[in-house]
Amino acid sequence: KFFGLLEEAENWLQTCHLQGYAASHEPLGMAYLPTLSYEEMMEWSLPTRAQREYSKLTKEIKDSEFPQSYAKFVRGGFWRNFLAKYPESNWMQKRITDISDRYHSLVSQMKLVSPRVKSIQRYIWQAQCNCAYWHGVFGGLYLPHLREAIWERLITSEKEMETLVYPRSKLLFTQHRDIDRDEFLEVCMGNSIYNIFFSPRNGGSVIELDYKPSGVNYSNVLTRREEAYHNRIPDSPEKSAQSAAQSIHEEQTSKEAGLKDYLNFDWYRRMSLLDHFLHPDTTIEQFWRCKYGEQGDFINQPYEVKDTLGKGAKVVLHRTGSVWIKDKLVSVKVSKQLGIGVASTGIDISYIITPADVKDVEVWFGCEFNLHFSSADAQQNFFFIPDATSENKVEQKLGNLKETAEYGPVHAFGIRDGLRGLDLILTWDAPAKIWVFPIETVSSSEAGFERSYQGNCLLFHWKLNLTPHSLWEAKCNLSVRPTAA
């Protein structure tokens, strides 16, 4: 409409580009612009506690006798605070920055840049669409479909670059690099089908698991965090009667009743391959709410790492930590190994747990995966038990992805993402019980406060009796494949 009005006024209104105006007009003076955006954006970028304090301060200024012109000197945060506030955003941003750097390095070595190579640049630009990297009142980072689109372009751009450098049958690598620029090294492992990124300092966990053929990051799960506006959520879907909203930034509506019951906050980041030692009285509801007894010190603590690259790529992560057994602290060693080959269609995972003390101990061990799927509501998406003769076939259809449930013991467990046409299957040699529940956040959007599906938590767990000089071992294969017709 705006451009239409410009065209209608072309007989008296002359338009020009900034470049043309600068060439024909002298500057009025010099100015250095501050690193600012509009007032609300600078408030949203602050940490939760600081955001509430800032909101209180600005309200006091507005209600005070101070001249309102003074308010412009009160400033909130800095946009890049979003990258510190949300590690998932930072990881996404640093990944695409790294890919962009590698792309330009590759292009600088070419005498002629082909249309195919130029198309990679478009994917890189698309992956930098800003709305998925931050959050205010418009959903943003909390909207999974926005992050899915970013990851699809990001993974595709990287995959296309790899095909320029490596023949499909030759790609296999392990690397130690500080991807997220936090001064700690991550470990990367991959082939033409999968990318796996580990954080040794955060429980030896998997930060990113990519299935390259479809451009899917299965680790695209957002951790449940407290937001400054959570204390303003009304009890009913009706608009709050506290005050009339003056703008969309002040909306006080709730899209459904009972949202406060979903205000569960995680004390650790929702990654995968997290190693739990549960209190004997832990229930699935306590675990869902992240208010349970964690007896070990493995979840967010550092692991030592070793990797090898030969016919296959292997990464071994291990930690000797402590587990509370009743009123005593017992030393336990956890070692986990992941491996892939050049042509591997799956990822091999193995665990070895050994007691370091000379006494029998009983522990409840769990291995946690947090995985993102296209939808929790779609009927085409569900849990299932794979057929023993063909893992692509469903032997038993289980519940949908919105349910909280316990299954098992089972050797194999599958998640069908019918909207994507993909099955993710985990097969264990040691039958495991499984807790499953959706990871859902409560966030603000232009339509009001809402619940958003971020992914599913799968906890494979075993009750073990560990004896001196013995070990418990379990092997797993994780694979992603197109859904069988």
Tell where the protein language model's regions lie, with residue ranges.
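Active-site and substrate-binding clefts of carbohydrate-active enzymes
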Residues: 1-185, 194, 419-422, 427-432, ...
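Beta-strand-rich recognition/accessory modules
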Residues: 287-335, 343-350, 357, 411-485
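Hydrophobic, well-ordered secondary-structure elements that form the walls
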Residues: 124, 193, 351, 469
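A structural signal for short, well-ordered beta-strand segments and their strand-loop junctions
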Residues: 12-19, 197, 349-350, 364-366
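Flexible loop/turn segments at secondary-structure boundaries
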Residues: 22-26, 132-134, 142, 196, ...
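Acidic-aromatic substrate-binding/catalytic surfaces of carbohydrate-active enzymes
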Residues: 192-306, 311, 320-322
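Acidic (Asp/Glu-rich), glycine- and aromatic
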Residues: 203, 208-232, 329-334, 341-388, ...
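Active-site/ligand-binding surface loops and adjacent short beta/alpha elements
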Residues: 360-364, 370-437
